[in-house]
């Protein structure tokens, strides 16, 4: 299986090291095509932690309903077969439903299970699920009409399939990879990175959240504003890895373009100005520049202290991330 292949040569070892990775062709290959296209339709919604049901019959599930399989099966050994489940969110569930086994400060497991990432479950408990808006609708938008996938055969396939954009929210990582492609031995070109970065930024700007600012009635010499943030995504905003956060930068300028108030100032050297070292509380009202609205998940260990060590996560100290439209506190996944 796929996961076993990544563990080649680790029998009797203490763990899979970076040195092992650098000598492992499959490890260097990362998440290849077959990691997803070999997933069988077997209780996908109930899986988590990367527990993928990988078939062992060299079947490659895809979106073409009547594929011409001669060339692919002959050249690669994989037989292309139509799989309806490849168009559904359930195929994303296992890798985007993640729980950890809590450890105390001595590294001993406490017996507690902590749900670290619940992106798929957030989608299940949303209006997007009820409206049949799948994960792929945003992250792998469909191509309309036919497309020539190869030189043989040279006719158009009349089926729709998903563009493999797989855009997330991490433009910073993509820029870091682009600028260090030689050191990382990456085959993607700067142009290819730039196109993905552009899609990522466009998704963040137009498909992720919507801001409304309204000035409230106040006394002379005072200003007050109401800021409304609407989550447009089919999961929490932000979602996934706990270190992800979103914050509001609010700037009020005067007639001479002078800054009268600035909350959420950010700089590469100092990060978010005013952010508390331990935990920045959720604010219903901000009256000082050292108060900043940060939407985030903050983990706590067994002693209640903040932690970024995933295995030590025991409690939620803060989770004011914006839920998706239609979420219900009565849903089994809540």
Positions of PLM-derived features:
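Primarily the internal scaffold of c-type cytochrome electron-transfer domains
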Residues: 8-334
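Acidic, Gly/Ser/Thr-rich repeat motifs that build Ca2+-stabilized beta-propeller blades
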Residues: 1-6
